[in-house]
Amino acid sequence: MKKQEHVVKKVLEDSIAQEMEIEPGDVILEINGNKIVDIFDYQYYIEDEYIEVLVRKPDGDEWLLEIDKDYDEDLGIEFENSLMDDYKSCYNKCIFCFIDQNPPGMRDTIYFKDDDSRLSFLQGNYITLTNMKDEDVDRIIRYHLAPINVSVHTTNPDLRCKMLKNRFAGTIMDRLQKFYDAGIPMNGQIVLCKGINDGDELRRSISDLMGFAPVMESLSVVPVGISDYRDGLFKLEPFDSRDAAEVIDIIEGFQKQAYEKFGTHFVHASDEWYINAGRPMPGAENYDGYTQIENGVGMVRSLCDEFYEALGEIPADDREYTASIVTGVLVYDHIKKLAEEIEKKFKNVKLHVYKIVNDFFGHRITVTGLLTGQDIKKQLQGKELGSRLLLPENTLKCDEEIFLDDMTLDELREALQVEIYIVKSNGADLVNGAIGGNS
């Protein structure tokens, strides 16, 4: 197999790499005489005040660049392959895996299951640790790469093997202990499945993982997502409002213990639990800086707080404006209330909030981030949309104007014949977009 070459894709403006005349198409061969395996090696070897970088130019010439810099100063290089190596796929067959629940006919990358520790550091992905060798763990410790985000799900070894359908999954506590002993900061995640790892099993898991605090900085508990495409898969049941209330009670009990010991709440319930239980969201101080927001923990609280702060800073006026807002079923009531607050302050602003039901994955999928272009198009055609449609950015692929079903933003814009304003994931941008501000 041909060895991966580390080809430069982009050189940042005013960077060391630009100063040293490194250009797109160049290949980084060595740093300080060391061959580079992947992004771990690269980041480790550039952390010095003096480095020597061997570069091969497109014409075959090799340059040895001597660089003086600050210890932790980056070179300003982006590579064609962000990992600088092949991606590691998942070895598990988790009973709750959402990728297995995708409908047929989607783009190939949607079906790829990654479980690569390097993506944990680069992108914040959560990994199970089951495909890591001892030398991989030792390498993370040696390079002190952090934080590492771990999909734990349960600390019961036998149960974890069953849930992940992997006979090697039961060593999770040993792995976490090694990271704890080395002082490697961690975050954890539990995908909760009714009747499987909830109740007493959840209590056990939280208690065990709290033993790694404060090195393990946070733990999120999220409900399993259940689509309509589960034929032949493990039977899973949705949680009801009573279940949600029980989960919250368990978590909040441990939060009190954690706060007394560590000064943080440690374990957090995702927003979905509070909405389904009909309970108010905790205050911002309960989220410990929103360390788990990417897992749906504190999104509503953060959005609302930012929204009210931004709205309070804008003086009321008599502008006339009509717009529409797309949202998923889960947070519809919250978004509707925020829209009403804008209408109260700006008497001539009219906002239509549309709750989009997820026909693509199934009606049990209620989060906004899994809405597709075709569902939005189908459910908004013929509706009053006003001067613009506000669309949350998490409905689109990162850095691309494309939905999960491969519909493009231009196709949706053409179908609905309306200006589309992409709302960033903060309350201030929601206010700005709703009253006609520029993006």
Predicted regions and their residues:
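Flexible glycine/acidic-rich beta-alpha junction loops that bind and position SAM and/or redox cofactors
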Residues: 196, 216-242, 261-285, 358-363
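Radical SAM enzyme core and accessory elements
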Residues: 7, 278-439
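Terminal peptide-recognition signature
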Residues: 17, 25-28, 53, 97
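Short, Lys/Arg- and Gly-enriched loop/turn segments at beta-strand edges
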Residues: 35-42, 61-64
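PDZ/PDZ-like groove recognition
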Residues: 1-12
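Structural preference for beta-strand elements that scaffold enzyme active sites
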Residues: 147-149, 185-187, 218-220, 266-268, ...
